[in-house]
């Protein structure tokens, strides 16, 4: 008797289009060339490469250029084909690429930092080159004259840099976990505010100028969405990685956030839902459910002749509870907890199946990601890994 085979439900996942291999060291940054089947990469092996797809279907370098120092970061402007490369020795080197992407012409060098350049950003509208370095300096230069316009000393080494052209606000995330917002003028800057939300260093920043929302990724494995435009101080946590978050990209047309981590995970978050802030954890000397004393509350332990318990916290209500009153686990996707977390028994009963419906999808890139670039027009994602490989993905099955 033949058994009926039930068709498997189709799982929507990114489609691997191409592996681009050949770098001797880690590719620190790379971008997809718009309107071309090409990739520009800068690597720790000191090379700048422009990879174009050949008739064979493989990507081969049309440009292979050796720099005097390892390449730490880059910024590419498609309109002018201007490529700004940050180097380990503190220099930013600028090139113009030819229309056919077969030649790069040196333009100028900026002696921007005393040590490794960590981030570089070319702003076409203002003709500015913004950068951060391991010397804890943020600097901006005029790309026309090459002159340094100003600088600001950050509290720690910066690892995230974003700029809003309309307001001239610059966002700097650093290794201490702090995010700093500066207002830039032509030759001076004003500190507007700084804030912290991560328990680890900030590893990535992403700015959405339409919703006026800043996303920060951290070595504490979390992503935080900061509502800058709302002016209410709202911060939404997203917990979906098992290792440090290395890169962020936002798809404005679908309101989806792509976060990638050292765990190889590509997480696509639906940001078109009404998310909730996680509550502050409350302090108490005894369980706020059963009133059992916690182990440091000697007086109540002595008076009630009870052994002190360890304190836990419910992730939904924030109350201090004992292990017995928080024995259950649940995901709370609208609070950013896509994995199961500790909740008190009463909150567990109150959470509905609708509230447990996931708001993110999880995918495995099969390499530890150090950098990503998203091409929204084609729906392609580039990931660069510690395995020295660049991968190109078609994200349209999951970003739509």
From Swiss-Prot:
Main subcellular location: other
Q: Which GO terms describe its cellular component?
A: cytoplasm; early endosome; vesicle
- Which InterPro entries does UniProt cross-reference here? G-protein_beta_WD-40_rep (IPR020472), WD40/YVTN_repeat-like_dom_sf (IPR015943), WD40_repeat_CS (IPR019775), WD40_repeat_dom_sf (IPR036322), WD40_rpt (IPR001680), WDFY1/WDFY2 (IPR042234), Znf_FYVE (IPR000306), Znf_FYVE-rel (IPR017455)
Q: Which GO terms describe its biological process?
A: positive regulation of fat cell differentiation; positive regulation of protein phosphorylation
> Where is Zn(2+) 2 bound in this sequence?
314, 317, 344, 347
**FYVE-type ZnF:** 281-352
What does its record list under induction? Transiently up-regulated during adipogenesis (at protein level).
Gene3D superfamilies from the UniProt entry:
YVTN repeat-like/Quinoprotein amine dehydrogenase, Zinc/RING finger domain, C3HC4 (zinc finger)
- Annotated tissue distribution: Highly expressed in the brain (at protein level).
**What SUPFAM superfamilies does the entry give?**
WD40 repeat-like (SSF50978)
Ranges: WD repeats = 22-61, 66-105, 112-150, 153-192, 197-236, 240-279, 364-399
Q: Which UniProt keywords apply?
A: Cytoplasm, Endosome, Metal-binding, Repeat, WD repeat, Zinc, Zinc-finger
Q: Is the keyword Repeat assigned to this protein?
A: yes
Q: Where does Zn(2+) 1 bind?
A: 287, 290, 322, 325
Q: Where in the cell is it found?
A: Endosome; Early endosome; Cytoplasm
A molecular function annotated in GO for this UniProt entry is: zinc ion binding
Domain free text: The FYVE-type zinc finger is essential for its vesicular localization.
Assembly and interaction partners:
Homodimer. Interacts (via WD repeats 1-3) with AKT1, AKT2, PRKCZ and PRKCI. Interacts with VAMP2. Forms a complex with VAMP2 and PRKCZ. Interacts with FOXO1. Forms a complex with AKT1 and FOXO1.
What biological function has been recorded for the protein in this entry? Acts in an adapter protein-like fashion to mediate the interaction between the kinase PRKCZ and its substrate VAMP2 and increases the PRKCZ-dependent phosphorylation of VAMP2. Positively regulates adipocyte differentiation, by facilitating the phosphorylation and thus inactivation of the anti-adipogenetic transcription factor FOXO1 by the kinase AKT1. Plays a role in endosomal control of AKT2 signaling; required for insulin-stimulated AKT2 phosphorylation and glucose uptake and insulin-stimulated phosphorylation of AKT2 substrates. Participates in transferrin receptor endocytosis.
The protein here is known as WD repeat and FYVE domain-containing protein 2
UniProt source species: Mus musculus
- What's the encoding gene here? Wdfy2
């Amino acid at each position: 008797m033949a058994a009926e085979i039930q068709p498997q439900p189709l799982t929507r996942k990114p489609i691997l289009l191409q592996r681009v291999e050949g770098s001797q060291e880690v590719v620190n940054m790379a971008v997809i060339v718009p309107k071309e089947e090409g990739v520009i990469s800068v690597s720790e092996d000191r090379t700048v490469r422009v990879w174009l797809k050949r008739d064979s279907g493989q990507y081969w370098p049309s440009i292979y250029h050796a720099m005097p120092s390892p390449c730490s970061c880059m910024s590419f402007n498609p309109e002018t084909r201007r490529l700004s490369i940050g180097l380990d020795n503190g220099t930013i080197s600028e090139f113009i690429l030819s229309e056919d992407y077969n030649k790069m012409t040196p333009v100028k060098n900026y002696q921007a930092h005393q040590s490794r350049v960590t981030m570089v950003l070319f702003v076409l509208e203002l003709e500015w080159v913004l950068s951060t370095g391991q010397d804890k300096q943020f600097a901006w230069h005029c790309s026309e004259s090459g002159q340094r316009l100003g600088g600001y000393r950050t509290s720690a080494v910066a690892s995230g840099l974003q700029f809003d052209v309309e307001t001239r606000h610059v966002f700097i995330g650093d290794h201490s976990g702090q995010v700093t917002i500066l207002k830039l003028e032509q030759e001076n800057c004003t500190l507007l505010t700084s804030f912290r939300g991560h328990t680890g260093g900030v590893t990535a920043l992403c700015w959405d100028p339409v919703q006026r929302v800043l996303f920060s990724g951290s070595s504490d494995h979390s992503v935080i969405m900061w509502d800058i435009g709302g002016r209410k101080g709202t911060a939404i946590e997203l917990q979906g990685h098992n290792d440090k978050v290395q890169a962020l990209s936002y798809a404005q047309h679908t309101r989806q956030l792509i976060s990638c981590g050292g765990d190889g995970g590509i997480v696509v978050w639906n940001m078109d839902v009404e998310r909730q802030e996680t509550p502050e954890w409350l302090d108490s000397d005894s369980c706020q459910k059963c009133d059992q004393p916690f182990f440091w509350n000697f007086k109540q332990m002595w008076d009630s002749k009870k052994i002190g318990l360890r304190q836990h916290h419910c992730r939904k209500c924030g109350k201090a509870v004992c292990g017995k009153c928080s024995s259950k686990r649940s995901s709370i996707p609208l609070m950013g907890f896509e994995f199961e977390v500790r909740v008190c028994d009463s909150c567990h009963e109150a959470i509905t199946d609708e509230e447990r419906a996931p708001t993110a999808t999880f995918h495995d890139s099969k390499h530890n990601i150090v950098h990503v670039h998203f091409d929204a027009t084609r729906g392609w994602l580039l990931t660069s890994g510690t395995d020295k490989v660049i991968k190109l993905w078609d994200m349209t099955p999951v970003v739509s």
